[in-house]
Amino acid sequence: MSFKELDPEVWSAIQQEGARQNRTIELIASENFASKGVRAAQGSVLTNKYAEGYPYKRYYGGTEYVDVVEQLAIDRLKALFGAEYANVQPHSGSQANAAAYMAFLQPGDKILGMDLDAGGHLTHGAKVSFSGKMYQSYTYGLDAESEQLDYEAIAKQAREVQPQMIVAGASAYSRIIDFNKFREIADEVGAYLMVDMAHIAGLVAAGLHPNPVGIADVVTSTTHKTLRGPRGGVILSQEKYAKKINSAIFPGSQGGPLEHVIAGKAIAFGEALQPEFKAYAAQIIKNAQAMAEVFTATEDIRVVAGGTDNHLFNLDLTKTGLNGKQTQELLDSVSITTNKEALPNETLSPFITSGIRIGTPAITTRGFNEADARHVAELIVTAIHHYDDAKVLKDVKKEAEILAMTHLFE
């Protein structure tokens, strides 16, 4: 019996989602298109196998083949980032962060991470997150004029707070992060340094962003986004920390690992080790910079921090008459997918926001080049400037869908 015959409702929803992905232009910075190999691994018989523990040291029998798969993932990940130690079991980036905190901190310890409005992540100390509930969290922001990290201000804050851990990394920051400066700050106050490179991992792997491995005490990441793998997490560190990180994952915060997802991770890491991945990562940045230039040339759409060095950037829509939520919904209506984004010193609700975030990993996977990226940016500008003109929006949608359908993913 086919999948369609077995469950036509689920099958239909999946088919419709596939069609939606192909006909829309995906600009959510945290999304990408996984390869056929990655997707096949996740739908393989490995989903049937329980394997508590670690390769060659399990609590269950019958693990000889999942051991091979997980060890491949570990070895490839270590090679990709030059790490002494790697754990590929975290179910997500948030799980990886939770385990990293558990391994190095005690409940009530102080952490200093990037503020949400500055581009940080919920798990970097936001009060609504476990990281802001289990630990005393403090946050740093950006320089008011440059909208970039102010390392002297962060150092001053670290001296005042005296945190046990400093967290570097972001989910909406468009400039290079100087991990060596964070290391100096952490050393000065006697803190551990954790880097969350979830968004930039693919760029780091390609040598296009500084590598935090070997600088930070612990590095966490997701495996999708710029790495183009399955949805999941990883932890990288030094061998001396292996035992406590392993224990923080299992049995500390997870039970059985998802070996079918780990197989997908292994495939993605293998893909990222190939020479063509560096060209792909370079094109991501070129596309982001090409788009940012289009917005910079307008009078009412401002690129936060003045541009981008990576795969994303934020747009300040204050002068357009639209907020982030309205713009996200507007662009959805013309088959361009983005997300609303809080800006530095945001005054609106996180459900509304003053901006949107733009990312290029997904369109680059589909073969978009700089000319295509500029075309997309121009469509966005047209939609924003004619948000109440149904005829113009109809034309923008048609053009966006034609552009998308000429860059199909497999």
From Swiss-Prot:
It is an enzyme of class 2 (transferase). GO terms for biological process: glycine biosynthetic process from serine; tetrahydrofolate interconversion. Keywords: Amino-acid biosynthesis, Cytoplasm, One-carbon metabolism, Pyridoxal phosphate, Transferase. InterPro entries: PyrdxlP-dep_Trfase, PyrdxlP-dep_Trfase_major, PyrdxlP-dep_Trfase_small, Ser_HO-MeTrfase, Ser_HO-MeTrfase-like, Ser_HO-MeTrfase_PLP_BS, SHMT-like_dom. This is Serine hydroxymethyltransferase. It is found in: Cytoplasm. The modification N6-(pyridoxal phosphate)lysine is found at K225. Its EC number is 2.1.2.1. It catalyses: (6R)-5,10-methylene-5,6,7,8-tetrahydrofolate + glycine + H2O = (6S)-5,6,7,8-tetrahydrofolate + L-serine. It comes from Leuconostoc citreum (strain KM20). HAMAP family: SHMT. Belongs to the SHMT family. SUPFAM superfamilies: PLP-dependent transferases (SSF53383). Pathway: One-carbon metabolism; tetrahydrofolate interconversion; Amino-acid biosynthesis; glycine biosynthesis; glycine from L-serine: step 1/1. The record marks H224 as: Plays an important role in substrate specificity. CDD domains: SHMT. Its cofactor is pyridoxal 5'-phosphate. (6S)-5,6,7,8-tetrahydrofolate binds at L116, G120, H121, L122, S349, P350, F351. Gene3D superfamilies: Aspartate Aminotransferase, domain 1, Type I PLP-dependent aspartate aminotransferase-like (Major domain). Catalyzes the reversible interconversion of serine and glycine with tetrahydrofolate (THF) serving as the one-carbon carrier. This reaction serves as the major source of one-carbon groups required for the biosynthesis of purines, thymidylate, methionine, and other important biomolecules. Also exhibits THF-independent aldolase activity toward beta-hydroxyamino acids, producing glycine and aldehydes, via a retro-aldol mechanism. It comes from the Bacteria. Homodimer. NCBIfam families: PRK00011.1. GO terms for molecular function: glycine hydroxymethyltransferase activity; pyridoxal phosphate binding. GO terms for cellular component: cytosol. It holds the Pfam family SHMT.
